[in-house]
Design a protein with these regions (language model features):
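A cross-family phosphate/adenosyl-ligand binding-site feature
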Residues: 1-125
Length: 125
Protein backbone atom coordinates (compact mmCIF):
# COMPACT_ATOMS: atom_id res chain seq x y z
CA UNK A 1 0.00 0.00 0.00
CA UNK A 2 1.35 3.41 -1.00
CA UNK A 3 1.08 6.40 1.33
CA UNK A 4 -1.48 7.97 -1.02
CA UNK A 5 -3.78 4.92 -0.91
CA UNK A 6 -6.75 4.87 1.43
CA UNK A 7 -8.44 1.98 3.18
CA UNK A 8 -11.90 1.64 1.65
CA UNK A 9 -14.63 1.91 4.28
CA UNK A 10 -17.67 1.98 2.04
CA UNK A 11 -18.95 2.76 -1.42
CA UNK A 12 -21.68 5.30 -0.68
CA UNK A 13 -19.84 7.91 -2.77
CA UNK A 14 -18.54 5.57 -5.49
CA UNK A 15 -18.74 7.24 -8.87
CA UNK A 16 -19.44 10.65 -7.33
CA UNK A 17 -17.29 13.66 -8.11
CA UNK A 18 -17.15 15.96 -5.10
CA UNK A 19 -15.84 19.51 -5.19
CA UNK A 20 -14.25 20.36 -1.86
CA UNK A 21 -14.00 24.12 -1.33
CA UNK A 22 -11.52 25.27 1.30
CA UNK A 23 -11.56 28.80 2.71
CA UNK A 24 -9.34 30.58 5.21
CA UNK A 25 -10.87 29.47 8.49
CA UNK A 26 -8.59 27.68 10.95
CA UNK A 27 -10.55 24.46 10.37
CA UNK A 28 -8.79 24.29 6.99
CA UNK A 29 -6.15 22.25 8.82
CA UNK A 30 -8.64 19.32 8.70
CA UNK A 31 -8.78 19.35 4.88
CA UNK A 32 -6.28 16.49 4.51
CA UNK A 33 -8.29 14.23 6.79
CA UNK A 34 -11.60 15.16 5.13
CA UNK A 35 -10.33 14.62 1.58
CA UNK A 36 -8.99 11.19 2.51
CA UNK A 37 -12.27 10.29 4.24
CA UNK A 38 -14.25 11.20 1.12
CA UNK A 39 -11.92 8.97 -0.90
CA UNK A 40 -12.40 6.11 1.61
CA UNK A 41 -16.07 6.12 0.61
CA UNK A 42 -15.32 6.08 -3.11
CA UNK A 43 -15.50 9.76 -4.08
CA UNK A 44 -13.33 11.45 -6.65
CA UNK A 45 -12.26 14.73 -5.03
CA UNK A 46 -11.31 18.01 -6.67
CA UNK A 47 -10.35 20.90 -4.41
CA UNK A 48 -10.60 24.66 -4.81
CA UNK A 49 -8.59 26.65 -2.28
CA UNK A 50 -9.02 30.36 -1.66
CA UNK A 51 -5.87 32.46 -1.20
CA UNK A 52 -6.52 32.70 2.54
CA UNK A 53 -6.85 28.90 2.78
CA UNK A 54 -3.39 28.60 1.24
CA UNK A 55 -2.00 30.59 4.15
CA UNK A 56 -3.20 27.87 6.53
CA UNK A 57 -2.51 24.67 4.57
CA UNK A 58 -0.44 24.11 1.45
CA UNK A 59 -1.89 22.99 -1.88
CA UNK A 60 0.79 20.27 -1.93
CA UNK A 61 -0.64 18.63 1.21
CA UNK A 62 -4.17 18.89 -0.15
CA UNK A 63 -3.14 17.44 -3.52
CA UNK A 64 -1.53 14.48 -1.73
CA UNK A 65 -4.70 13.85 0.28
CA UNK A 66 -7.20 14.29 -2.53
CA UNK A 67 -5.16 12.67 -5.30
CA UNK A 68 -7.06 15.06 -7.55
CA UNK A 69 -6.79 18.50 -9.03
CA UNK A 70 -6.27 21.41 -6.65
CA UNK A 71 -7.37 24.75 -8.09
CA UNK A 72 -5.74 27.72 -6.42
CA UNK A 73 -6.22 30.57 -8.87
CA UNK A 74 -8.12 31.77 -11.90
CA UNK A 75 -7.47 29.83 -15.05
CA UNK A 76 -8.33 30.69 -18.62
CA UNK A 77 -10.57 27.62 -18.80
CA UNK A 78 -13.05 27.35 -15.94
CA UNK A 79 -15.44 25.09 -17.86
CA UNK A 80 -14.57 22.20 -15.54
CA UNK A 81 -16.19 23.96 -12.59
CA UNK A 82 -19.58 22.51 -13.47
CA UNK A 83 -18.72 18.80 -13.58
CA UNK A 84 -19.46 17.94 -9.95
CA UNK A 85 -22.17 15.89 -8.27
CA UNK A 86 -22.00 18.00 -5.10
CA UNK A 87 -20.05 20.83 -3.52
CA UNK A 88 -18.81 20.73 0.06
CA UNK A 89 -17.30 23.93 1.48
CA UNK A 90 -15.41 23.59 4.71
CA UNK A 91 -14.60 25.70 6.49
CA UNK A 92 -17.15 28.17 5.14
CA UNK A 93 -16.18 31.63 6.33
CA UNK A 94 -18.78 34.34 6.84
CA UNK A 95 -17.21 36.22 3.95
CA UNK A 96 -17.70 33.31 1.55
CA UNK A 97 -21.27 32.67 2.70
CA UNK A 98 -22.19 36.36 2.31
CA UNK A 99 -20.57 36.52 -1.13
CA UNK A 100 -22.46 33.39 -2.22
CA UNK A 101 -25.80 34.65 -0.90
CA UNK A 102 -25.36 37.95 -2.75
CA UNK A 103 -24.35 36.27 -6.00
CA UNK A 104 -20.76 37.51 -6.15
CA UNK A 105 -18.40 35.52 -8.36
CA UNK A 106 -14.97 36.93 -7.61
CA UNK A 107 -13.06 33.65 -7.48
CA UNK A 108 -13.08 30.07 -8.73
CA UNK A 109 -14.89 28.74 -5.65
CA UNK A 110 -17.73 31.25 -5.96
CA UNK A 111 -17.94 30.52 -9.70
CA UNK A 112 -18.27 26.80 -8.94
CA UNK A 113 -20.91 27.47 -6.29
CA UNK A 114 -22.87 29.59 -8.75
CA UNK A 115 -22.71 26.83 -11.37
CA UNK A 116 -23.84 24.24 -8.80
CA UNK A 117 -26.75 26.44 -7.71
CA UNK A 118 -27.76 26.87 -11.36
CA UNK A 119 -27.78 23.10 -11.91
CA UNK A 120 -29.57 22.37 -8.64
CA UNK A 121 -26.62 20.35 -7.34
CA UNK A 122 -26.32 19.84 -3.59
CA UNK A 123 -24.24 22.47 -1.81
CA UNK A 124 -23.15 21.86 1.77
CA UNK A 125 -21.36 24.42 3.93
Amino acid sequence: MRDTDVEVRGDSLRGRHILLGVTGGIAAVDTVRLARELRRHGAQVTVIMTPSAQEIITPLAVRWASQGEVITDWDGDLSGLSDFDAVLVTPATRNLIASFVHGLMNGPLLMALSAARGRGSPIMM
